[in-house]
């Protein structure tokens, strides 16, 4: 069974969204695609960088996420292949699930967001 990925993104936790948008947009030259106080997407060529607010100001790891056409189908495929399903949350109208791949790496899999 194959999952249909509609977008791959590299997620970066930020404390100050405006400051982060200036850094990634003005300094690094990424193009702003979508902005909100909690979630902002910038692109460089075909890559999407998603800024997500939170983290308490401490250094944190970034992580890889995938948006899929059918989240439930993707979760079945991931578990069938030996991945593990983790915590689920609803973030701004998007259903997100943490998963672990077969090598122990954490990923986020999300359904289609309500904002596009």
Range-by-range predicted roles:
Residues 16-31:
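Amphipathic alpha-helical segments
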């Amino acid at each position: 069974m194959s999952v249909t990925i509609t977008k791959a993104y590299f997620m970066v936790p930020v404390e100050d969204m405006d400051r982060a948008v200036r850094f990634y947009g003005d300094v690094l030259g990424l193009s702003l695609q979508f902005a909100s106080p909690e979630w902002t997407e910038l692109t460089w060529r075909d890559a999407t960088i998603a800024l997500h607010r939170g983290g308490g100001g401490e250094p944190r790891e970034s992580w890889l996420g995938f948006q899929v056409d059918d989240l439930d189908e993707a979760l079945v495929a991931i578990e069938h292949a030996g991945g593990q399903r983790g915590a689920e949350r609803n973030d701004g109208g998007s259903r997100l699930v943490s998963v672990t791949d077969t090598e122990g790496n954490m990923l986020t899999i999300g359904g289609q967001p309500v904002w596009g």
